[in-house]
Amino acid sequence: MVKLGFHVSIAGSLDLAVERAAALSCDTFQMFTRSPRVWAAKPISDGTALAFKKALERFGIGPAVDHMPYLPNPAAEKPDIYAKSIFTLTEELNRCHQLGIPYLVTHLGHHGKEDGHRKGQEKVISAIGQALDDSEGDTMILLENTANEKNTVGGTFA
């Protein structure tokens, strides 16, 4: 069965994303669980998670799909960015688990000039493995491909 959905806003609260998707006659939808433009995330309260799950049930929409924030770069050459990227991926997997979201979309990032494409791929694989090991639940990570711009990982799988 084909499902149609859109990326919807979480403005106001996470459960409003479900209502917005329903108002658009979506069968499924994608969202951010937090601002995509900053590293820090406000914790999701148990009440917020429950309201989100109840909205999914009430509107019969699913599965919900989460999208990683824009800042993480699991292929990063700089150690501090790489570490923050793994932390954020792990944190986002835990947020998905808390909300009952089965899928998390992530960009693969950009490798540094010194690292090169192959090392960038290896870093992404390692980052994803570590985040899966360190997180709760069984959320599936979906890898978003790119247009194969300079230094991107995910534009080709060669």
Predicted features and spans:
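Active-site acidic/histidine proton-transfer and metal-coordination neighborhood
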Residues: P74-A158
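N-terminal pre-domain/capping segments
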Residues: M1-E91
